[in-house]
A protein has these predicted regions:
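Cysteine-dependent hydrolase recognition
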Residues: 1-464, 472-474, 482-491
Length: 492
């Protein structure tokens, strides 16, 4: 699809050539290292992606009772850490297979990844078809629309508001780096919590998430507690939901939470359920395989989102390359900003925590990130290029917005606009008994949501300003998403 040269290599051939016929995950690395050596430094010939087309189990030899019933021919191997008993420090890592430097592999916590790695956790032809079809359909982008301009950030309560603080910080960071995306925040503690004989729940949060999942989003990002069977103690979204989702607009799910996708186990889990759901779920899943530290999850979450939304030479990074670069960022020290003196602020993680993160999906697939820019030329005939002028929207008036697609005068298609009111300070409810109420800023009021045509790269639309607006001098926000008629060019 993207002009890649692809090698399809049966696992048994790799074992024969690189591990003396014995099934060994190291054979995958040695094969990639051979390709790297043969490239002799020529970037065009270097191996870039490894798609592990097959599920795996922690018992690579399949000697235990749970694994004896499985057919080894239906599975690939995985790399398990030497410490395999501690839930926090043990890990399964596909990224290890992409560490190709001379003498590397023995200390993966401090070593950089050379090849982007992802996995299709499939063991039957039916499962394989599901993931292949999902990937092809996503790349063909038949369901393209403004839903692909939405990033939803979700955060659990508890832990002295840690998860909500982290999610809010990451969301604000991404909004600053990529202001053209529409950011939505769902903080558990901002909603009413109900209690019954089976425990606590957040019905409104569940409704909002399921509604967004049905409508679609580019990324659904969650920070908080989790297990293989549920997100948060309140079971806001459960394994059964991921099995039953019916949505054609497939997001990338990202979870900065414990144990969401232990794909080397024999029990069902949310990560695999999301990508193997034939009727919806996710096009790919980026999450953790074991218990992780919440304070370090923020580092990985921020680094991955920054990379996966970025572009290079006018093209979005692939999800596998984003994973590789994010992992390497935390080894080198990720620069997330600068202090008042201009010195870089960095985040690093040389622990096994970052190795808990894995990608279920095609590493060579990019997200459908818009690559062109939509420019607002004027609001109510007041030019946006005039810094001294300020367009005021008043309740009951008809507002007009004119704009164009930058660098493409031949663009014909549709533009979708979402106009939101000024930011509001939201104070949470302290449902979990925290000493201080968590507060965050969000845009909760939508003034207009609609579409209009783009002709010759230009557009204009009007809308009536509602009466229940925030009566302040603070700025509103216009998010725009445009797609051409043959659905091959996107802008925001």
């Amino acid at each position: 699809h993207n002009g890649l040269r692809v090698n399809l290599v049966p696992a048994d051939e790799l074992y024969n050539e690189f591990s003396s016929g014995t099934p060994d995950a190291g054979a995958y690395r040695r094969y990639l290292r051979m390709l790297q050596d043969r490239a002799e430094g020529n970037e065009a010939n270097m191996p870039k992606y490894l798609l592990l087309f097959g599920d795996c189990v922690w018992d690579n030899r399949m000697l235990t009772a749970d694994c004896k019933r499985l057919n080894p021919d239906d599975y690939l191997l995985c790399f398990e850490s030497e410490n395999s008993l501690n839930k926090i420090y043990c890990y399964v890592s596909d990224s290890w297979m992409g560490i190709l430097s001379e003498g590397a592999g023995g200390s993966p916590t401090t070593q950089q990844q050379d090849v982007a790695v992802g996995r299709f956790p499939v063991s039957t032809p039916e499962e394989a078809k599901i993931m292949v079809d999902k990937t092809i359909n996503y790349m063909e982008n038949a369901n393209a629309g403004s839903w692909q301009n939405t990033l939803m950030f979700m955060a659990d309560d508890g832990n002295d508001n840690l998860h909500m603080k982290d999610a809010d910080e990451v969301a604000n960071y991404i909004a600053d780096k990529y202001p053209d995306f529409q950011i939505k925040k769902v903080m558990w503690d901002a909603y009413q919590r109900t209690t019954s004989s089976v425990g606590n729940s957040y019905p409104e949060v569940t409704r909002i998430i399921k509604e967004q999942q049905a409508n679609g989003a580019l990324i659904m990002d969650y920070a908080g507690h989790a297990s293989a069977g549920q997100l948060s103690h309140e079971q806001v979204v459960k394994l059964m939901d991921f099995n039953n989702f019916k949505n054609t607009n497939l997001p990338l799910w990202v979870t900065a939470a414990c144990d969401v996708m232990p794909y080397d186990g024999v029990e069902d889990n949310i990560g695999e359920a999301a990508v193997l759901n034939p009727n919806g779920g996710a096009v790919a899943f980026y999450g953790t395989t074991r218990t992780v530290y919440a304070n370090r999850n923020k580092y990985m979450n921020r680094a991955f989102l920054y990379r996966v939304l970025s572009t290079k030479d006018g093209k979005p990074l692939t999800i596998g390359e984003a994973h590789r670069q994010a992992q390497n960022d935390l080894v080198k020290g990720n620069v997330i900003g600068y202090d008042k003196e201009g010195k870089p602020i960095t985040e690093s993680d040389l622990t096994s925590n970052r190795l808990q993160y894995a990608l279920l999906g095609d590493p060579a697939m990019p997200l459908n990130v818009p690559t062109l820019k939509v420019v607002v030329d004027s609001v109510n005939s007041i030019s946006t290029s005039d810094a001294s002028a300020k367009a005021m929207l008043k309740a009951g008036m008809v507002a007009r917005i004119d704009g164009h697609i930058e660098g493409n005068e031949a663009f014909n298609g549709v533009v979708t606009a979402t106009v939101r009111d000024s930011k509001e300070l939201i104070t949470c409810r302290q449902n979990d008994g925290t000493s201080d109420a968590f507060t965050f800023y969000d845009r909760t009021k939508t003034l207009y949501n609609g579409s209009d045509s783009v002709v010759g790269g230009k557009f204009s639309f009007q809308f009536a300003v509602p009466k229940d607006i925030n009566y302040t001098d603070e700025s509103g926000l216009v998010n725009l998403y445009a797609i051409n008629n043959d659905r091959t060019i996107r802008a925001h």
